[in-house]
Amino acid sequence: MALLEIQGLTKKFGGLTAVNNFDMVVEKGEIAGLIGPNGAGKTTVFNTISGIFKPSSGKVLFKGQDITGFSPHNVVRMGLVRTFQITTVFSDLSVLENIRLGSHLLAKLSFWDDLLTTPYQRRKEKELFAKAATLAEFLGLGDKTNELAKNLSHGHQRALEFAIALASDPEMVLLDEPVAGMSSEETQEMMRIIRATRDRGVTVLLVEHDMKMVMNICTNLYVLNFGNKLAEGNPQQICANESVISAYLGSEYKPKC
């Protein structure tokens, strides 16, 4: 069943066509990848899906509903969240406080609940902090809940950003270069987290340049080049595709297929 479907997506910036007539289908429960050279249009696709950009033409469907042009806030409310290339956490808040902020859409607190600190508000806050602690444990941050985010390693900050995204109980998460700048050990841990997230019922679409990671974790791949879809298929098909090898992977990658 298609959870996310992109139909004929085009995004132009003045005379530049960043993405041209792009189609993509992500099935519920899969880990899909969007790959290609720098400047290929991958982040533009993510920004259009998540409501940061409005497309010049085409549609974005999520759970069968047309969400084209939805605001980022409303896209999140639909159950579709994303992370960014640059780590975005609240540096001077603790790990637990950061994750709690990610669940603000679940709080359903009225103005009076917040103003008067009602019993419902206190109970809800307790529940959300307990959930934040559970997510911290799931993301390998269980022993760091009271640490300030700015004191975490790069790998742990990326895990925290992932936890913040998961705190809103999404059905799908978009990961923009989740292992960029990570060590081999940190990359393996992030792969474990992504697979475990999929196993919890969350569909994943990622952009990543670490081809070893992508080929090991993704079930289906889409390749962009100069804004155009160059290829799609499973990892074995993609790494054996001559056009993809020529435009992106390089000839030295072919023997690894």
Question: What is the role of each PLM region?
Answer:
Residues 1-257:
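Glycine-rich phosphate-binding loops of nucleotide-dependent enzymes
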